[in-house]
Amino acid sequence: MRQEQTLFSRPLPIALFILIALAADQFIKYLVEAYLPFQQGVPVMPMLALYRTYNYGVAFSMLSGMEGWFIVGIRLAVVTFVLWLWRRTPKDRFFAHLGYAMIIAGALGNLVDRLLFGYVIDYILFYTATWSFAVFNLADSFITVGAGAIILDELLQAKKERSLKL
């Protein structure tokens, strides 16, 4: 039986998606660097501010004390692993392939920052009067939403397999 190919299971669409997402991430970071004051909140709406800061580590500033090339190596290993998963995943799994594309785009967006500046530019802050979430960026959002898409795909696949057994 022939598997139906989803859009992001093909190399050209995934490459275009990644390039467009990477360009959007880098353009926004350029604007943030050019116009947003450093470590001063600019309220956008209740509980959301723009707040430019630099992350010298990985997610939530973990590993910020590590050598920069070690972190670059980790990011390259993640991209390589996700590409490997993308190639091995059945071609009919739309959300998984979309998730892989988003994770790759996000990892590359932060990798470009790391290579150019030695840190990642973060600028989105959710907060209340007594609490604030870690400052993050569009690339981080791609990674998070991409992981969610992969989990959704797994849940849908499990449901599909259960319904076929009935």
From Swiss-Prot:
It comes from the Bacteria. Pathway: Protein modification; lipoprotein biosynthesis (signal peptide cleavage). It is an enzyme of class 3 (hydrolase). It is found in: Cell inner membrane. The active site is at residues 122, 140. PROSITE patterns: SPASE_II. It is a multi-pass membrane protein. GO terms for cellular component: plasma membrane. GO terms for biological process: proteolysis. Keywords: Aspartyl protease, Cell inner membrane, Cell membrane, Hydrolase, Membrane, Protease, Transmembrane, Transmembrane helix. It catalyses: Release of signal peptides from bacterial membrane prolipoproteins. Hydrolyzes -Xaa-Yaa-Zaa-|-(S,diacylglyceryl)Cys-, in which Xaa is hydrophobic (preferably Leu), and Yaa (Ala or Ser) and Zaa (Gly or Ala) have small, neutral side chains. Its main location: membrane. Pfam families: Peptidase_A8 (PF01252). Its EC number is 3.4.23.36. The keyword tRNA processing does not apply. InterPro entries: Peptidase_A8. Belongs to the peptidase A8 family. NCBIfam families: lspA. This protein specifically catalyzes the removal of signal peptides from prolipoproteins. This is Lipoprotein signal peptidase. It comes from Rhizobium meliloti (strain 1021) (Ensifer meliloti).
